């Protein structure tokens, strides 16, 4: 893992140098471009308080965050809209903590590589406070398939690692960054934040980690004396926009399953851009989940009772109910969502919250009266509450987190994770097309009402 970390760090240094050179090439009037290098050792604590972590005893994650940062010189519209944020390329090495007892599973180490952005909250000569948002791929050394005991019956045994299900995971990080300049070139700093790492049920198990952390470190800024004259950009020329997206992926339902199940979705929505960097609107979502099937050991998708020749059979595991079949309609769900978009140039962050209006699978779940086992609970309302608590079942509402990147004109590539409460259902990848409608003040004869993104649209 140390060799991997060093290799990734070397690649990151090279990439940072190339980006700095590209920025210089795009600004020929300056032969230099400011950038910074930082290192922040950190230590944290796990928020997860469940049987998967209790067996490890008192363990704490620790490691180091490193980054290569590029302060804004206001040469692009999105930088002006967001108050000149700092962007960076980061790499983190994490020791997840190893218990002292020899018969307890090992958590191992991890490495994450990610872009990040620092949004200014306070900016003075002697102190800066910024909000950090980061996300990218993370890699771990220890998971379910690196251990000898892979028997699902031993899932909760102390010697079994159930935190990660595969090497590749999604890494998310958010926090508050504090910076105290000492000289023009050197600053001391601290950072306090939250780390999440999991695979979004691409593999099982998918417990993942959730950790708070604190860190202190140092930042060295090169070419800090370079100053550029800010460019004044016009506002975004469009207000309303229609988004149409199709996406698909695959996920695992239970550890014992030998295959993954297809998932797919379709989204159509309208967003109004309240500001140059934020839009809000409503959307229609249709989801297909092939894991609603008899070919899984996950009892979450299982008909509670079924009648065979007049005999009521109690289904406790879907793998034993081969006579039960599921229709296409039971694999489909539809919902209406509140869509939020946060624009960072060609990249847009997505935060959606939706509620199902068509959700037949809510009648499938095993959910018996505590005092009258065997009697199925009556059909649920659309807005039902699980008596077993969060995570025991899926919810009547959903959250979708992700990002889309414009690749050409109004065409974009998208990656999103769909969750029920704090439990991930799947990660999907897709393509979409945005139709932005020009504001009346920006329309001209012969150009129509639809805006088309071009590299330097503000110069036209």
What spans do the regions from the language model cover?
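Outer-membrane beta-barrel "beta-signal"
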Residues: 210-229, 424-460
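Surface-exposed strand-loop-strand hairpins of Gram-negative outer-membrane beta-barrel proteins
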Residues: 45-63, 100-107, 250-269
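Residues that define the transmembrane beta-barrel architecture of outer-membrane proteins
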Residues: 33, 58-64, 83, 105-113, ...
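Repeated loop/turn-to-beta-strand initiation elements of outer-membrane beta-barrel proteins
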Residues: 75-77, 180-188, 224-227, 276-280, ...
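Transmembrane beta-strands of outer-membrane beta-barrel proteins
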Residues: 35-39, 85-89, 129-135, 188-190, ...
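Extracellular/periplasm-exposed beta-strand and loop segments of Gram-negative cell-envelope proteins
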Residues: 97-107, 141-151, 157-167, 203-207, ...
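Transmembrane beta-strands of outer-membrane beta-barrel pores
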Residues: 41-47, 70, 91-97, 135-143, ...
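Residues on the lipid-exposed face of transmembrane beta-strands in outer-membrane beta-barrel proteins
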Residues: 39, 64-72, 113-121, 133-137, ...
